């Protein structure tokens, strides 16, 4: 499908879907002792899983059941939400292929742990959050032992390599979508699904954005949070600043990192670069200082959109992957914000190989300065955030998780409760 056709398909899906997700009814679970297994593989997923865990406890009580026993894969945040964690895949998260290959024995062990838990603890439902590379194989194991699977934060198969959905729909009983056009796509591929809204809106409700960024002067660089991302993106971003400095010599620039894990790497790339400050652990504060941003394509774009910050989006593509992406990519934009808006609100640049940083720098100047382009972006960001729905995604997701227990077939329940013991 050509670009115009892809744009039209997304816009049609947005028009056909209700703006606000619905709160489902609770099943009658009076007196039922439930065991629920949650899994998250990265820090961002753990935040959403922890919020979901708390809502599951509240929803079970509201449905007449005692507090459920929560088991799972995750870290300290998930434990603080009441989950007994059996391992922490987030501590092993990696993006480069060499690192992932080295971790294969660890991930194989996770699959074995899940299988053992399905046999010994007989969970009523398995709830993986995001991270399909790990969770689709896990879902297959849960299905093998008759445990229904509700996947919260569905994979973006609609963006590239959509054929992967064939395996997905075989191992997932219910997919919980977070973007307003996703449900129509999963409907077309016969995947049972429900739109619950974006979980980041729950966090936004807890910390409303400060007044708009028009009276600020800082440019924020968001190169990603992993080693490979930083090494690929940060030097290119710094080079793009040359065009900004030519127009605004004294503009303050900040690089934001959520943790100090890669502080030495960032400082090594910075070298003697002047006028750039590294900030660690204060994303919210940095967003509150920013007038404009240059960011990698990823979940952080939802945060800049929440703050109304005009942003240039960078997506680096190696020459080796260029041809493959052309054949697999099925969306007109890389950024989720643009996809939700149904148009290119944030200017996007897919840079192949070394590329030329000048166009990015020039675009950054245009959105930094007052003018029609900046105003148009800010209007589009408001529209995109409205389409994500309001807060309550975790509450809606928890009700869907409990609701699937009502529809469990006698055959599956027998398979779950009589799973092999060895």
Where are the regions that the model predicts?
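Nucleotide-activated sugar donor-binding and catalytic core shared by glycosyltransferases
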Residues: 1-422
